[in-house]
Amino acid sequence: MFAITTWKENWEPNVCFHGWSCFHGDKTAFFAVMGNLYQHTHTYANIQRDQCFCINFLPISYYDRLVETIHHNEEKEDEFAVGNFTLEEAKTIHAPVIQEAFMNIECSLKEMKDLSGAGITSMVIGQVQHISVEEEYARGDEKRYGKDGFMMLVPGQQNLVTGEAGQSAVATVNIEKYD
């Protein structure tokens, strides 16, 4: 889980707490692929308009502050102030960056694709332009995994016998074995 940051149309900073992504690349380029971004949101409109966004990874201790931005995300609201985040300018794109994040990934928009054609969600692909990582996170896996590292969304598990949906959860990653 991470925060997508963009500028709103009125130049207020936007924070979108998001939980679906993967990252791909080769020797020529690296990409952030975000699934299930709702098309009716200002985050979607901001990315479409400005052709860029930043992905900000924060530890689970910031969870409640990120959720607060969901409840106070009107166009006129400064979502950095709502979440009590420090705003910095991105180095290579026109987007705000959360200074408290241990990793920021600056992306230019490569493609938006409505896979179902229903006009509800889109897959958003960003080409990575720059990555900033705090040194203690860059030097090894000790800080990246565990309570100070990446958050993961654990979707509500469905009971395969009854069809009843379970509650979603937020987890941190614990390395169990090296191979």
Residue spans of the language-model regions?
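Basic, polyanion-binding surface patches
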Residues: M1-D179
